[in-house]
UniProtKB/Swiss-Prot annotation:
Region (Disordered): 1-30, 151-171, 275-294
UniProt feature, compositional bias: Polar residues: 10-25
Keyword Nucleus applies: yes
Organism of provenance: Saccharomyces cerevisiae (strain ATCC 204508 / S288c) (Baker's yeast)
Phosphothreonine: residues bearing it: T49, T91, T119, T242, T287
GO terms of molecular function: eukaryotic initiation factor 4G binding; mRNA 5'-UTR binding; mRNA binding
Protein name: Single-stranded nucleic acid-binding protein
UniProt xrefs under CDD domains: RRM_SF
Length: 294
């Protein structure tokens, strides 16, 4: 096991449930988010202003509509492909009607994406659910079924491409080469994600929205009680990013983001692999096994 992997693994295992860094991050939005009167807008053009978005809704909902486009400093020199916004209406809304009428409207030469707003509590608990399961080169499994199985075989020893998997009674099943597995047409597998990155930050970096991000959170152990719990703030260093639209060139997306620096880490990017439907679930070690973070 390399020194880098051992160091990263030990740092995670030594965290206590009482560590201040594990406390959930305070919301960065000024808008009080209530899904009954607030919507989330993704894929907002950099040139778009709060007033530009407000004018889109004023005719139907009146001048009391308020818009917030959070401003964030990017110290790594990377400028995200788009911004996001929160729109708050003066009364309760019919979300489906708003989505039908305003989703994919073009503002400043860019389609906006209307999504349901989620409270900070919902964002902490919620996970992306989609169709099919994806496996990345580092052995991530089942991320888009709402259940996460960390595909590691032991501390610091994660499976790489097409690694053989254990079957029942210790019998190994024949491995399936990665290049023979079906690739996703709209999803990227991202490795070496900063441990403290949130779904919203990942979404902003890739120019999409939080609902299109699968960001597995770490399993950790309370040093005092021995209890295993899911971290509120530390992810497992990997993510899956899905891009919406009918004409997504996922190979081009992979090339666009390959080698980009997010936070202080250079990302490893690949097109996600779709896990076969008959691929059996495995019970893997939930602790002491983390992705390499150099």
């Amino acid at each position: 096991m390399s020194a880098e992997i051992e160091e990263a693994t030990n740092a995670v295992n030594n965290l206590s449930i009482n560590d201040s860094e594990q406390q959930p991050r305070a919301p960065t939005h000024k808008t009080v988010i209530d899904p009954e009167d607030t919507i989330f807008i993704g894929n907002v053009a950099h040139e778009c202003t709060e007033d530009d978005l407000k004018q889109l809704f004023v005719e139907e909902f009146g001048d009391e509509v308020s818009v917030e486009i959070p401003i964030k400093e990017h110290t790594d020199g990377h400028i995200p492909a788009s911004k996001h916004a929160l729109v708050k209406f003066p009364t309760k809304i019919d979300f489906d009607n708003i989505k039908e009428n305003y989703d994919t409207k073009v503002v400043k030469d860019r389609e906006i994406h209307i999504k349901r707003a989620r409270t900070p509590g919902q964002m902490q608990r919620g996970g992306f659910r989609g169709r099919g399961g994806f496996r990345g080169r580092g052995g991530f499994r089942g991320g888009f079924r709402g259940g996460y199985r960390g595909g590691f075989r032991g501390r610091g020893n994660f499976r790489g491409r097409g690694g053989a998997r254990g079957g029942f009674n210790g019998q190994k099943r024949e491995k399936i080469p990665l290049d023979q597995m079906e690739r996703s047409k709209d999803t990227l597998y991202i490795n070496n994600v900063p441990f403290k990155a949130t779904k919203e930050e990942v979404a902003e970096f890739f120019g999409t929205d939080a609902d299109s991000i699968s960001l597995p959170m770490r399993k950790m152990r309370d040093q005092h009680t021995g209890r295993i719990f899911t971290s509120d703030s530390a992810n497992r260093g990997m993510a899956f990013v899905t891009f919406s639209g009918e004409n997504v060139d996922i190979e081009a997306k992979a090339e666009e983001f390959k080698g980009k620096v997010f936070g202080d880490r250079e990302l490893t990017v690949d097109v996600a692999v779709i896990r076969p439907e008959n691929d059996e679930e495995e019970i893997e070690q939930e602790t002491g096994s983390e992705e390499k973070q150099e």
